[in-house]
């Protein structure tokens, strides 16, 4: 997750206000993640990385990740109705194998995930429009085998996208929330 329009806002505000706004949003968003069984891996400036299916196994991790993403987007849209400083989120989700564990040195060690799966999720987030959720075809395939409520969520094919640093493109889908939008086609 990354806040799409945070840098221009941060340029206009005092540092204390920037920290307060970020911390307020992080408190709200990370509670959604933890309630869904996600692991908050790290906060990086105006974004954060979440793991599902590690460190705790979850058979429906793709559904949990998408439901969390939808809940976070809903929360941001709702918060923007009453807050002076409006933010947008960009969320990229990809599923696959990753190197997961304690990585670092004796001075600084972090439990984290690294590898192509992590990089692909980040690259998906980078091509998102504000308030958009993009998922890879790998995540989409897992969702089709899990219990995601098709009455509230649809997946819109976005075609094959070339992501920075990858030798070949990947099929991408946007996640549309029928609670926020009426312009969508149900998931098949």
Q: PLM features: residue spans?
A:
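Catalytic core regions of nucleotide second-messenger enzymes
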Residues: 36-37, 41-44, 74-92, 161-163, ...
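Catalytic strand-loop-helix junctions within cyclic-nucleotide turnover domains
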Residues: 51-61, 91-110, 130-131
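Cytosolic regulatory/linker segments at or just downstream of nucleotide-handling modules
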Residues: 98, 127-188
């Amino acid at each position: 997750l990354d806040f799409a329009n945070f840098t221009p806002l941060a340029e206009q505000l005092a540092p204390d206000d920037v920290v307060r706004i970020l911390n307020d949003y992080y408190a709200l968003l990370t509670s959604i993640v933890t309630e869904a069984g996600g692991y908050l891996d790290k906060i990086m400036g105006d974004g954060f990385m979440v793991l599902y299916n590690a460190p705790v196994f979850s058979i429906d991790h793709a559904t949990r990740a998408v439901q969390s993403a939808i809940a976070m987007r809903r929360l941001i849209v709702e918060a923007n109705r009453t807050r002076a400083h409006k933010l947008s989120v960009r969320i990229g989700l990809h599923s696959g194998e990753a190197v997961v564990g304690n990585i670092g040195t004796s001075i600084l060690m972090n439990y984290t995930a690294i590898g192509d799966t992590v990089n692909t999720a980040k690259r998906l987030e980078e091509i998102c429009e504000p308030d958009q959720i993009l998922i890879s075809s790998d995540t989409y395939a897992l969702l089709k085998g899990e219990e995601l409520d098709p009455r509230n969520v649809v997946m819109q094919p976005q075609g094959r996208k070339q992501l920075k640093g990858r030798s070949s493109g990947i099929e991408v889908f946007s996640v549309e929330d029928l609670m926020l939008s009426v312009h969508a086609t149900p998931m098949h």
